[in-house]
A protein has these predicted regions:
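Conserved beta-strand edge residues that scaffold enzyme active sites
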Residues: 97, 131-133
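N-terminal beta-strand/alpha-helix entry module and adjacent surface
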Residues: 1-87, 109-118, 122-125, 133-147
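Beta-strand-loop-alpha "switch" segments that mediate conformational coupling across diverse proteins
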Residues: 128
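Short, solvent-exposed loop/turn segments at secondary-structure junctions
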Residues: 98-103
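Short beta-strands and strand-loop turn motifs
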Residues: 91-97
Length: 147
């Protein structure tokens, strides 16, 4: 019996840490409606580039963290990484349209469906996905029965 030994493979051991970049004071402590959530993120969405912001909530709808995906192309892996590391039970997603037009695109609708599906698998509810336009105008996927 002449068994050939397979060479050993090196496996990386990785430690992930959530590092607080900064904090914001949120006076109402709880997200009771869409406007509460918008007030928490509106300053992060003022940009000439498209930004995607995730608000992570606990079971009492209290914000536990806020994360930003610095890309127009959003992958559920990046969105839920923030949520999982924050021990969130729910998320609300926001993104701006620098053009000021708050109408959603087919890509916006597709990523919303993907986020909802991934959230169901992970046990993290997608509460809403909101597209922000000019002058505090917005499109809510939930209010328009798209979630």
């Amino acid at each position: 019996m002449n068994k050939k030994r397979t060479p050993a493979k090196r496996v990386d051991i990785v430690l992930l840490k959530l590092v607080k970049e900064r904090s914001v004071l949120y006076e109402t402590r709880k997200i009771s409606n869409l406007y509460d959530a918008y007030r928490l993120v509106k300053n992060f969405l003022v940009s000439d580039r498209e930004k995607f912001v995730v608000v992570c909530l606990d079971t009492k709808n209290q914000p536990v963290s806020r994360g930003t995906v610095n890309s127009a192309i959003v992958h559920p892996r990046e969105v839920f990484k923030v949520a999982v590391l924050s021990n969130a039970s729910k998320i609300i997603c926001f993104h701006n349209h620098p053009s000021g037009n708050m109408d959603f695109s087919s890509e916006d609708e597709e990523i919303t469906k993907r986020l909802q599906k991934c959230g169901e698998i992970l046990g993290i509810e997608l509460v809403d996905h909101i597209v922000i336009g000019d002058d505090d105008k917005y499109f809510s996927f939930k209010e328009n029965c798209k979630i």
